[in-house]
């Protein structure tokens, strides 16, 4: 029985391993592999139960480590902390590994300084552990680019010095040798060379590429590009290296070489991440041929959307009939349009509904529940005077009967919508007439939690907006729904009145100008044809166009302001508001 368990586990057939193990849970080895297989299959509650049973039967440090891992996977962090600290008191052969797990737990829970202390102590005891150094350097990788860069530079300096010491014979590995003959000396020299090569490979393929990316995130673009360029020969088979290099080239407006770098990454690993990064580049360019190629790659986003996608089966069915018959496949059919991405994408791509309404017999549109009332009311208003959406029905729940289903963001692909056609299509949201306010009302929105720790930073501080609006004869109205902030009595807080997107729409009806970050409310404001200033950080999303010349192809009237320096940006924003 155990041989079967071992066989299936080490051949990565965790389902079969779990199935066999669960028939013999009285055997401690079977129980161990049942727990490990459950972890591999992300059946976390089952993994925790088995880990607890293991620890009851055999309270070793190893089983304690397994239990702590199960606690972490089930977000039981306090239990994990308590267990790991208890295990440390044993001071046994797994002392280092328990510390590593504790450091990982500190990282997960945001206690990065505590994690840093553990790694520093471990490195004092074992300064030549390459993987330990890598983990240490990566502590702040997503949270503090300056600290992360400093750690990478510390690592590089240490290992460069180590290499020099080995070359000079000042540092010699312990080598078992009974004689001092020529053959042994030759073998020792060969081992030294292998060690040097190993260190250099570690730096050139694992550490320096990360340093180059950190330089990019800190906007030290020339340094980043120079370092990436110098590392190419060592990373010919490293797909992630080429993906990150492509991002820096793209930001530097070197779009052709960025395209080649993304293609290089794809040639090494045909992963969805590389495909939709390439899609973003192509769609950012704003030319018809690039947009057409980008649409195809953009479909790869659904690889990561299985949990949000209504049905992979129905999407694949739609793709198959489209590949066979093209757009004609949807003529006189009942088509379900579902939404698998954010609110902003739903609003932005909703103008593409007009095209499918021209082709299909009936369109069943199922927006996110928070948007249902808004779209239902808007379609009702529009259908009183227009025919564009007469065959469209807004649904609160997903239907059981339809011919084909497709995501709203896939409409440009399935409906063969050209780039120049997009802005001509009508958004199913009725535009507001310009308000007649004696004192202009300025709406503001500056923060979204979705932008925290994301690849593209979008948020600004409230004070930045207030500085730009200071001493201006306008009434400021906040639409900020989330975040830790305090508004002065001079600012009206309309967020208190908002429960869904229909409320948001209604509360925008008297706004003269909306100042917002890249967010869903930006798209809604633009759909309502409210003069809208979209504030962007230097690295921004593809939908706002080229880095050196931002322009929205979905919203041509958007006033886009890229803020590179906040003091200068506040001055530019102040001037831009006065023109609206």
Model-derived features with residue positions:
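Alpha-helical solenoid repeat scaffolds of the TPR/TPR-like class and their adjacent stem/linker regions
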Residues: 1-513, 518-580
């Amino acid at each position: 029985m155990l041989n079967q368990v071992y066989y299936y586990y080490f051949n990565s057939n965790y389902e079969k391993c779990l199935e066999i193990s669960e028939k013999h849970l009285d055997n401690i080895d079977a129980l161990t592999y049942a727990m490990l297989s459950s972890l591999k299959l992300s059946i976390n509650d089952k993994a925790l139960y088995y880990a607890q049973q293991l620890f009851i039967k055999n309270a070793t440090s190893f089983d304690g480590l397994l239990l702590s891992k199960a606690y972490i996977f089930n977000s039981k962090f306090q239990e994990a902390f308590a267990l790991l600290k208890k295990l440390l008191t044993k001071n046994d052969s797994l002392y280092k590994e328990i510390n590593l797990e504790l450091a990982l737990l500190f990282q997960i829970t945001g206690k990065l300084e505590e994690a840093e202390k553990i790694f520093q102590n471990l490195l004092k005891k074992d300064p030549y552990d390459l993987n330990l150094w890598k983990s240490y350097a990566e502590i702040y990788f997503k949270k503090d680019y300056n600290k992360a860069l400093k750690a990478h530079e510390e690592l590089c300096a240490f290992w460069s010095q180590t290499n020099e010491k080995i070359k000079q014979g000042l540092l010699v590995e312990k080598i078992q040798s009974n004689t001092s003959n020529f053959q042994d000396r030759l073998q020792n020299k060969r081992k030294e060379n292998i060690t040097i090569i190993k260190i250099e490979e570690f730096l050139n393929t694992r550490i320096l590429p990360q340093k180059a990316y950190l330089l990019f995130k800190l906007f030290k673009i020339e340094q980043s590009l120079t370092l990436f360029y110098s590392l190419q020969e060592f990373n010919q088979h490293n797909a992630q290296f080429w993906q990150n290099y492509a991002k820096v080239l793209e930001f530097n407006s070197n779009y052709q070489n960025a395209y080649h770098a993304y293609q290089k990454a794809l040639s090494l690993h045909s992963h969805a991440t590389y495909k939709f990064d390439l899609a973003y580049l192509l769609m950012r360019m704003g030319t018809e041929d690039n947009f057409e190629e980008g649409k195809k790659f953009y479909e790869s986003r659904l690889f990561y959307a299985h949990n949000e996608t209504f049905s992979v089966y129905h999407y694949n069915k739609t793709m198959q009939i489209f590949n066979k018959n093209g757009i004609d496949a949807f003529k006189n059919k009942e088509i379900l349009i579902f939404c698998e991405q954010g609110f902003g994408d739903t609003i932005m791509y909703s103008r593409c509904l007009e095209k499918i309404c021209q082709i299909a017999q009936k369109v069943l549109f199922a927006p996110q529940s928070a948007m249902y009332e808004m779209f239902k009311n808007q379609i009702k208003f529009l259908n009183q005077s227009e025919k564009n959406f007469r065959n469209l029905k807004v649904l609160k729940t997903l239907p059981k009967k339809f011919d084909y289903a497709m995501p709203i963001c896939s409409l440009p692909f399935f409906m063969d919508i050209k780039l120049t056609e997009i802005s001509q299509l009508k958004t199913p949201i009725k535009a507001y007439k310009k308000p007649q306010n004696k004192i202009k009302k300025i709406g503001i929105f500056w923060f979204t939690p979705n932008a925290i720790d994301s690849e593209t930073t979008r948020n600004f501080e409230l004070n930045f907006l207030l500085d730009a609006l200071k001493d201006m004869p306008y009434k400021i109205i906040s639409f900020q729904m989330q975040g830790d902030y305090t508004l002065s009595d001079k600012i009206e807080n309309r967020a208190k009145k908002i429960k869904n997107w229909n409320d948001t729409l209604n509360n925008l009806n008297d706004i003269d100008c909306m100042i917002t970050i890249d967010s869903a409310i930006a798209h809604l404001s633009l759909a309502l044809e409210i003069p809208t200033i979209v504030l962007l950080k230097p690295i921004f999303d593809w939908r706002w166009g080229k880095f050196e010349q931002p322009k929205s192809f979905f919203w041509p009237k958007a006033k886009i302001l890229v803020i590179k320096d906040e003091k200068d940006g506040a001055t530019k924003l102040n001037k831009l508001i006065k023109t609206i």
